[in-house]
Regions:
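Start-transfer (signal-anchor) and selected internal transmembrane alpha helices
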Residues: 1-24, 458-464, 541
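Transmembrane signal-anchor helices characteristic of membrane glycosylation enzymes that use polyprenol
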Residues: 9-35, 115, 204-215
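Extracytoplasmic catalytic/substrate-binding loops of multi-pass membrane glycan-assembly enzymes
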Residues: 30-44, 52-72, 225, 308
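Multi-pass, polyprenyl lipid-linked donor-dependent membrane glycosyltransferases
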Residues: 39, 77-86, 108-143, 153-154, ...
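Transmembrane alpha-helices of multi-pass, membrane-embedded glycan-processing enzymes
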Residues: 65-72, 77-91, 132-135, 390-400, ...
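Membrane-interface anchor segments at the N-terminal boundary of transmembrane helices
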Residues: 75-76, 309, 313-419
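Short hydrophobic alpha-helices at membrane interfaces in multi-pass membrane enzymes
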Residues: 104, 142, 146-164, 196
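Membrane-proximal stem/loop segments at transmembrane-domain junctions that anchor or position
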Residues: 226-363
Length: 541
């Protein structure tokens, strides 16, 4: 009954959510059991099967696959990610409504998340992008769900813990956690947050990161998330590094970019002629990572303007109307439904731990082969849908600029600042430390839409929208409680007059002393609440 009431009261968003659900059912029918993202998916699956870290990438997604292994179904993994995509839309809608925005505006903010074809494609892929985005949106929901009120320590700690978990899926989660801690420290200085809240958030956010690093150290003898941070930063410098300017020491000269036309930065890691392949121990050995980090820092210090220009160029790619072909056409094709079933990853390619792609797929999928199959006509429908239904980078830039402009004008746009900072961080950090990739934009969209819609919220949400009762959550409704109705005033009742007592006849007994006369009724009750004062009733959902 409560669900039916909720659907009726939020019919516009319910229709959008139902259409988005149908779209995800179509994706599940079109590409079975799950779409495969090359070496990335192979690495995560190997971690999920053997609990062995891959030094080239953080393996938190592998732990998710390990947790989902008992049903032995890769299709279940894709289904879960579709649910997370829908859940992000629901959380954005709920927050927008809490901040007093109308249903149409709250629903509009969810459209890029619910219906973007590239969001849908990544939900179908065995990659951590969608779980990462969900953790970020859920953390924002916990932090912002009570507009105009102090954040409780427990809720803030839970949000920090979620951001710590997100760092195990994408390392940029560490930067988001640092932003939250910086905001809390600033709030502490102006007495808007207590020291207990800040300490709880710090410990909660550090817990998953420290636990993963400890697990990584048992295999690699290095307390870290990966063994590739230096390698990726080195690749960033390959688009501009000039060793005649850098003058690296002899041990690092091998890392100078090869002569000739420069490639996209990240390709220098995977290219067959990469200088990394000439070093002993491989591309991701501890020694290689250390040398690459030293070279990268020298290059940035020697050529800061060139570094800034390279980063600016790649950040600008995020806002092109047409999706840029970067790093190369082969990478871009991986984000297309049209190429989902292309066997561009050899089935016998080796995976961490000594397995193969085909063998690991079968091992996870109850012994059955699990290559991606495109099922017609559903796959053809999705290919057509992807040609038109996506958020161009230019519109993402407009969403970010709109949120920033409104915040600058209104100054106190409650709730918009933190999601805006998160969205910009997700867009900027990858080109800052590695390279631009189209998939890095998708997790930024929910936070960007949330920031834009909250920037237009009332300066302070009405009190009846800030206080949502437990009964509202229990019935599944999300409407604010109705304000209390004052009780009608009752007219004062005059005290009855006592009839005069006749004086007694003459008596030989002397008259007694006079007793004090009681005060009138009005004076006796002046210290009590007036009968005309309405009694406040608790709000109901």
């Amino acid at each position: 009954m409560g669900l039916v009431r909720g659907v009726r009261r939020h019919w516009l968003f319910s229709l959008a959510l139902l259409a988005a659900l149908a779209l995800r059912v179509l994706a599940s029918l079109a590409f079975r059991p799950i779409m495969w993202f090359g070496g990335d998916s192979a690495s995560y699956l190997a971690t999920g099967l053997r609990l062995i870290p891959d030094p080239s990438r953080v393996g938190g997604y592998g732990f998710l696959l390990w947790a989902l292994r008992p049903p032995h179904s890769l299709a279940l993994v894709a289904a879960l990610q579709h649910v997370l995509g829908l859940a992000m839309g629901v959380l954005i809608y709920l927050l927008a409504r809490r901040y007093g925005l109308p249903a149409w505006a709250a629903t509009l903010a969810t459209i890029p998340v619910l219906f973007d074809a590239y969001e849908l494609q990544l939900e179908s892929d065995a990659v951590p992008d969608i779980p990462f985005g969900f953790l970020v949106v859920l953390a924002l929901y916990l932090l912002l769900r009570s507009p105009g009120e102090r954040r409780p320590a427990r809720r803030t700690a839970a949000a920090a813990f979620l951001l710590g978990l997100s760092a195990l899926l994408w390392p940029v989660g560490l930067v988001l956690l640092a932003i939250l801690l910086a905001v809390l420290l600033a709030a502490l200085l102006i007495r808007r947050a207590g020291p207990v809240t800040v300490l709880a958030a710090l410990l909660a956010g550090a817990l998953p990161v420290a636990a993963y690093s400890a697990w990584f150290s048992t295999h690699d003898h290095q307390f870290s998330l990966t063994r590739s941070d230096g390698v990726y930063l080195w690749s960033r410098t390959m688009s501009f590094a000039d060793c005649a300017v850098i003058k690296p020491p002899a041990g690092e000269r091998v890392l100078c970019p090869p002569p000739g036309r420069r490639m996209a930065a990240s390709l220098y890691i995977w290219d067959g002629n990469s200088p990394l392949r000439t070093l002993p121990g491989g591309r991701f050995s501890a020694r290689t990572n250390r040398l690459a980090l030293h070279f990268a820092l020298r290059a940035i210090a020697a050529q800061p303007a060139d570094y800034a220009a390279a980063v600016g160029h790649d950040v600008a790619l995020s806002f092109f109307w047409q999706r840029p072909v970067h790093p190369d056409a082969g990478i871009v094709d991986r984000y297309q439904f049209a190429d989902a079933a292309t066997a561009w990853v050899p089935a016998q390619m080796r995976t961490p731990g000594g397995g193969t792609v085909a063998g690991d797929q079968a091992l996870y999928n109850r012994g059955r082969p699990a290559p991606t199959r495109a099922v017609q006509p559903y796959a053809r429908w999705l290919v057509t849908y992807q040609r038109y239904a996506y958020l161009p980078g230019t519109l993402l830039g407009v969403i970010l600029l709109a949120g920033l402009a409104v915040m600058a004008v209104r100054r106190r746009a409650y709730g918009a600042g933190l999601p805006w900072a998160f969205a910009v961080t997700i867009v900027v950090v990858p080109p800052l430390v590695a390279d631009f990739d189209l998939r890095y934009l998708v997790p930024a969209v929910p936070a960007a839409c949330l920031a834009a819609v909250l920037a237009f919220a009332p300066k302070r949400a009405p009190a009846d929208q800030r206080r949502w009762t437990t009964s509202a959550a229990a019935t599944g409704t999300t409407e604010p409680a109705e304000p209390p109705v004052p009780e009608p005033e009752e007219p004062p009742v005059p005290a009855p007059e006592e009839p005069p007592v006749p004086a007694p006849a003459e008596s030989p007994v002397p008259a007694p002393a006079e007793s004090p006369v009681p005060a009138p009724a009005e004076e006796r009750t002046s210290s009590l609440p007036s009968a005309s004062t309405p009694t406040a009733r608790p709000e109901n959902a």
